[in-house]
Amino acid sequence: MGFSSLVCVLFFFLGVKVYCQYESYQWDEDYDQEPDDVYQTEFQFQQNINYEAPFHQHTLGCASECFCPPNFPSSMYCDNRKLKTIPNIPAHIQQVYLQFNEIEAVTADSFINATHLKEINLSHNKIKSQKIDHGVFATLPNLLQLHLQHNNLEDFPFPLPKSLERIFLGYNEISRLQTNAVNGLVNLTMLDLCFNKIDDSVLQEKVLAKMEKLMQLNLCNNRLESMPPGLPSSLMYLSLENNSISSIPENYFNKLPKLHALRISHNKLQDIPYNIFNLSNLIELNVGHNKLKQAFYIPRNLEHLYLENNEIENVNVTVMCPSVDPLHYHHLTHIRIDQNKLKAPISSYIFLCFPHIHTIYYGEQQSTNGQTIQLKTQVFRRFQDDGDSEDHDDHHEGPEEEGTEENIDAHYYGSQEWQETI
């Protein structure tokens, strides 16, 4: 292999490494794990990675401050270079990465030549709303993703191009949203507004209702006291953790039939309608860290239920599952119910209603005098066979490590012998 061939191979692998670093976006967090208390952004800066430009950074047409991989000529990487202004962006660039700099303004001429841009990452800078020239993003007809998280924004950026599909605005100081700010965002599928200063008044006019393709809405860590009104029926993932929501209106979710995941932990929920979560497509439900005193109806397709840190004293299984249909069993597999006020494990009748359950995490419970108690069974696991048991041991992690376990016969519940015991 000649010298030129070796150089080409080297450039290829370097380009793939850089490209993969920025293009591996996740739709959302892993449903198998409890959401972190600290909101996770799409891109995480790693201290042990060298983000400086390689020696061959001066690719034809690339800004001198940045790096344009030869194998990915449409991408320009300008991150972590202590830039105070946006460098010149060539017309052929489609992705520009400017995160972890000291940029304070986005001027009208920032993208004047870069009309082919599909993705802009300006996260982790010092940008204020008044320093964004009006319409600077709206002039980009091909823009699909816009990252502005971890800045100093006070207003929702407006106007934006109707081509936009994903916008990240978490970790700002946004407290205002114009009524017509999102009217033209007909293609938006993901809106991240976590860690801002949004209260009920900001969403009163049902400003989100016209986003007919919206699938993921993140409103965690804001100042909401009630459920946001007028959400689009296309929604599949709704994050409302760490607000001050105390109730959910009757029939609130009737217009959200596609909802797959609902996270409303760390709020002030107390009494909620019995069948409020009767959603046929719901897979994950997190209502932990509230003030709930009793269980509620569990929809048939729900798999993961988080009830930790509430005030539940007794779990009435017949409330969760009023009837048993042998042809259409419930799909529930995991329950987390630690840090409640249980005095005994859940009735074994639960395995007739929910035959697919294989983990119930009881952990510690709160006693009436404020001290913690431990039930005889802290972790209930059901192993279908020896292979499942070995596989679980290989992946044993988290708070369940300290619990005791019970192994049961998966086919016992539902048998004639079981029927005679109830």
Swiss-Prot record:
Region feature Disordered, mapped onto this chain: 385-422
Glycosylation site residues: N113, N121, N187, N242, N278, N316
Organs and tissues of expression: Bone specific (at protein level).
Stored SUPFAM superfamilies: L domain-like
Any one GO biological process: cell adhesion
Subcellular location: Secreted, Extracellular space, Extracellular matrix
Presence of keyword Repeat: yes
Keyword annotations from UniProtKB, A to Z: Cell adhesion, Disulfide bond, Extracellular matrix, Glycoprotein, Leucine-rich repeat, Proteoglycan, Repeat, Secreted, Signal, Sulfation
Domain LRRNT, chain residue ranges per copy: 53-91
Signal peptide start and end residues: 1-20
LRR repeat residue numbers: 92-113, 116-129, 142-164, 165-184, 187-207, 213-233, 234-255, 258-280, 281-294, 301-322, 331-353
PROSITE patterns per UniProt: LRR (PS51450)
Assembly, per entry: Binds the alpha(V)beta(3)-integrin.
Purpose: May be implicated in biomineralization processes. Has a function in binding of osteoblasts via the alpha(V)beta(3)-integrin.
Protein's UniProt name: Osteomodulin
Organism for this UniProt entry: Bos taurus
Gene: OMD
